[in-house]
């Protein structure tokens, strides 16, 4: 389990762990075996119980690669919308926790106000190549935005999620194959040479989440559905 992993990676604030935990939540929904939900709850509680210790390490002691450093580094979507999905997915049914909302609000603020964007508003990467769009960032932003739209009852977050789906897909789609490339470089206006299968999986996942959670009467729903199919 994540509690006895020697390196502690399985307990870390990381998008790979986030995806695994989402899988467990889906297993719980499919099997009604509460063991899966309990594991996710345990992970989330681990974040809350040790949050101030992790924050002290990073913000005061300047331990830049300490436990959960990405939660406080928050320089890209890997650190924010990608890693926070288990908290966002469970927030509607979770017991009220001040830290739960505090972390979600921090992440949402980063996506809306701090994350790098192109001039048209499309989310992009600050590095390793400035203003590069990656397929990763559709799943690291859109599912979180959809959950927060429901939690906050904020239709503008649905609009933002739909905008990112359509714009990221537009930039990354190779018209010759209709596959998404892994990246698009704003500096050269060129697609990356690779249509990475995992990246296409992220796109499919993010778009399917959108079709499941975006209100069907949303003005962009049909366009997203047509793009998906």
Task: Show the residue positions of the predicted features.
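Glycan-recognition and catalytic cores of secretory/periplasmic carbohydrate-active enzymes
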Residues: 1-229
